Regions:
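Flexible loop/turn segments at secondary-structure boundaries
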Residues: 1-4, 30-34, 79-86, 136-139, ...
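Conserved, mostly hydrophobic/aromatic
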Residues: 26, 72, 157, 217, ...
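C-terminal beta-sandwich/jelly-roll accessory domains of carbohydrate-active enzymes
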Residues: 223-297
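Generic recognition of flexible, low-complexity loop/linker segments
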Residues: 11, 60-61, 142-145, 192-193, ...
Length: 297
């Protein structure tokens, strides 16, 4: 860690010189501790990720970045305690089992994991979960416990002001309909509404884009399929919207374990007076973009 500490300022100067305005830091270590120099010499000291020494280190990194107007997205971070209010360049972090555990974790994250995160980890602050794995495959072909539509819904249910398109480009080329939502979804929100939910079972979140009149909705479930009635009263009254719907297929047995790629993209006209019926497959989800039809953005 001392090698990082000694070079942080120089590294941030380099990034600033090349116009880099954001960095993602990481502190992966297999045994859960990082090494630092022993001031007395001899055997290096070992520090826990959430210990005081690492808390000071993370704050030092964010302060150095802030002086150069560089944003920080920390992986293997300390927990969010509200200091992102003091340092708004501390834009996101992980701080829980992220999508990478679906790539190589034994076991991977079960379907209820992301639902639980909405009621636990995400209450503390933004989480860089790195959704959008449309291949639904991890290391050595390990299946990710998710449907394709669920990967899109995670962009709305798990808040982060910076999001990743975390899959390979060739996989997005194979799923252009799904990738369209990733291109369109906002990350900077003006309003957030929790429409329904039970801890560990299901949740539906709606958010309004800060830079347009568009609304986005994400709904996810655990390993059980669900049929949810969602009133659209959050939409602007008196305005007709085009609902661009990305959902699990309903007539072809969509299921995260047996048929995760069953997927439908469709459009409907709706208003704030309507109620949508969301059919979520086991381990599935639904993502919707609501665009005003009056042409006013």
């Amino acid at each position: 860690m001392d090698h990082y500490e000694d070079q942080i300022a120089e590294a941030m100067d380099l990034y600033a010189r090349f116009g880099v305005d954001s960095v993602k830091t990481g502190y992966v270590c297999d045994d859960g501790q990082v090494e630092r120099r022993n001031p007395a010499g001899g055997t290096p000291l070992r520090e826990w990720h959430d210990g005081q020494w690492m808390a000071r280190h993370h704050l030092h990194v964010v302060q150095e970045a802030a002086q150069r107007h560089i944003a920080v997205n920390a992986h293997e971070p300390i927990k969010d305690t509200g200091l992102r209010r003091t340092y708004p360049n501390w834009i996101s972090r992980v701080g829980a089992r992220g999508m990478e555990y679906n790539a190589w974790g034994q076991p991977p994250n079960p379907p209820e994991h992301e639902v639980n995160l909405v009621f636990t980890r995400v209450l503390a602050g933004p989480m860089d979960y790195t959704p959008g794995i449309v291949s639904l495959k991890g290391r050595n072909g390990q299946a990710i416990p998710s449907t394709l539509a669920r990967q899109l819904a995670l962009y709305v249910t798990l808040y982060s002001p910076i999001q990743m398109a975390a899959d390979l480009p060739e996989h997005y080329l194979q799923h252009r309909d799904a990738f369209r939502f990733i291109e369109d979804v906002a990350v900077d929100w003006d309003q957030t509404r929790a429409l329904n939910g039970e801890v560990g079972d299901y949740v539906t979140i709606a958010r309004k884009d800060r830079h347009s009149r568009d609304w986005f909705l994400g709904s996810i479930t655990d390993e059980h399929g669900r049929l949810l009635q969602v009133p659209l009263g959050f939409l602007e009254p008196g305005v007709r919207y085009t609902a661009q719907i990305y959902r699990d297929g309903d007539g072809d047995g969509a299921d995260y374990a047996s048929n995760p790629f069953a997927f439908v993209r469709e459009e409907r006209q709706v208003s704030s007076a309507d109620t949508l019926e969301l059919r979520l497959a086991p381990g599935g989800g639904q993502a919707i973009r609501f665009v005003p039809m009056d042409g006013k953005r």
